């Protein structure tokens, strides 16, 4: 199994101390998770105070991300494929996401088993409404977003366990860095039914792509 992950989802899972649970729910190990080569610079990990304040939201997340990066793999330079012509046509897709999509297409073409993990629903929505969306057919059922990842983990570890993890993490995270979906779906008074309804609602418009 190959997991291709963007920075955003790594941060959100680290904030909640759910990195390993996410991998386990996808039957993968840390070494099978590939991150962008720019992640350390993008999150300013060389400057702990700035990284925590501007990017990762808590000291706990900062420590977990650094530990995670010691064991996961780094993506090489993205292959140049015809898909790039479509990617540059979609302004909502940034350079990092472009690289993930190119690696995903390469894995598909080489019959490699993979999932793409991303917290960038803006890019995913843009693909779903792209006038040549058939060019992204290879992604169908291969994308894991925050919402589908949470549903996978609830199936794997149970709602009470995941809800406790998210609820415990919330006070540790700077409010402006805490995801609004997690704020809405999880909490001490939340039920599993409420949580799943929220997660489905927030991911419904990209359902075509999702693994869950």
List each model region and its residues.
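Active-site-proximal, substrate-binding regions of enzyme catalytic domains
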Residues: 1-114, 121-212
């Amino acid at each position: 199994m190959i997991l291709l992950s963007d920075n955003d989802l790594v941060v959100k899972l680290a904030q909640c101390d759910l990195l390993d649970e996410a991998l386990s729910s996808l039957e993968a190990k840390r070494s099978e998770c590939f991150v962008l080569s720019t992640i350390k610079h993008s999150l300013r990990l060389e400057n702990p105070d700035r990284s925590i304040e501007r990017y990762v939201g808590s000291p706990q997340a900062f420590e977990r991300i650094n530990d995670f990066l010691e064991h996961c793999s780094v993506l090489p330079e993205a292959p140049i494929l015809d898909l790039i012509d479509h990617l540059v046509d979609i302004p909502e897709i940034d350079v990092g996401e472009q690289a993930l999509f190119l690696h995903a297409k390469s894995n598909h073409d080489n019959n490699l088993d993979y999932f793409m993990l991303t917290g960038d629903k803006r890019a995913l929505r843009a693909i779903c409404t792209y006038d040549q969306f058939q060019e992204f057919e290879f992604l169908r059922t291969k994308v894991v977003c925050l919402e589908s990842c949470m549903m996978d983990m609830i199936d794997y570890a149970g709602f009470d366990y995941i809800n406790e993890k998210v609820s415990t993490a919330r006070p540790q995270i700077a409010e402006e860095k805490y995801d609004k979906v997690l704020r809405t779906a999880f909490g001490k008074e939340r039920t599993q039914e409420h949580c799943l309804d929220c997660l489905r609602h927030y991911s419904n418009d990209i359902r075509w792509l999702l693994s869950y």
